[in-house]
Amino acid sequence: MRSKYIVIEGLEGAGKTTARNVVVETLEQLGIRDMVFTREPGGTQLAEKLRSLVLDIKSVGDEVITDKAEVLMFYAARVQLVETVIKPALANGTWVIGDRHDLSTQAYQGGGRGIDQHMLATLRDAVLGGVRPDLTLYLDVTPEVGLKRARARGELDRIEQESFDFFNRTRARYLELAAQDKSIHTIDATQPLEAVMDAIRTTVTNWVKELDA
């Protein structure tokens, strides 16, 4: 079976780390063991430095990161990851399991920040080319639920400190994009943990079986 790219998406506190573990466990049970794991922003030395710049509220002192500068920083990190990790892995027959990818930018910057969607799509197509996830699991939670979980983990980063209105706009854009793309599967992540895990297992298992059909 040709290698695939699976991405896990969602608001802060949606449970992406747990979801990744379930995806890996499910794939292994299906006989798929050659995998690499990525996170965005990050995943390479350069991308991790960009991650610190864009997420650490103290990284640039009192200087405000403009919305468009933020977009370009995310894309710089993403391109580095795609070119140096994701593309080589897929070409080598290795499956890639990602914590976030371009859907995050379309939702957070396009929805939350209100940046022109055409500009974001044009930038995506120009710098990422044909690299797209084969399957995206969008873990849907309300900002109230997600941020409560995130705050329980400790100090919030620059994005996590945004307003509920910002996250409501981000969630709305996520749902809008998920409704338009059959490769994006929405999981109700407000359910009890075991129910969420079962939904992920079922989705991944059925999807892989369809690949074999």
UniProtKB/Swiss-Prot annotation:
Gene3D superfamilies: P-loop containing nucleotide triphosphate hydrolases. The keyword RNA-binding does not apply. It comes from the Bacteria. ATP binds at G10, L11, E12, G13, A14, G15, K16, T17. One of its GO terms (biological process) is dTDP biosynthetic process. GO terms for molecular function: ATP binding; dTMP kinase activity. Its EC number is 2.7.4.9. GO terms for cellular component: cytosol. InterPro entries: P-loop_NTPase, Thymidylate_kin-like_dom, Thymidylate_kin_CS, Thymidylate_kinase. It catalyses: dTMP + ATP = dTDP + ADP. The keyword ATP-binding applies. Keywords: ATP-binding, Kinase, Nucleotide biosynthesis, Nucleotide-binding, Transferase. It is an enzyme of class 2 (transferase). Belongs to the thymidylate kinase family. Phosphorylation of dTMP to form dTDP in both de novo and salvage pathways of dTTP synthesis. This is Thymidylate kinase.
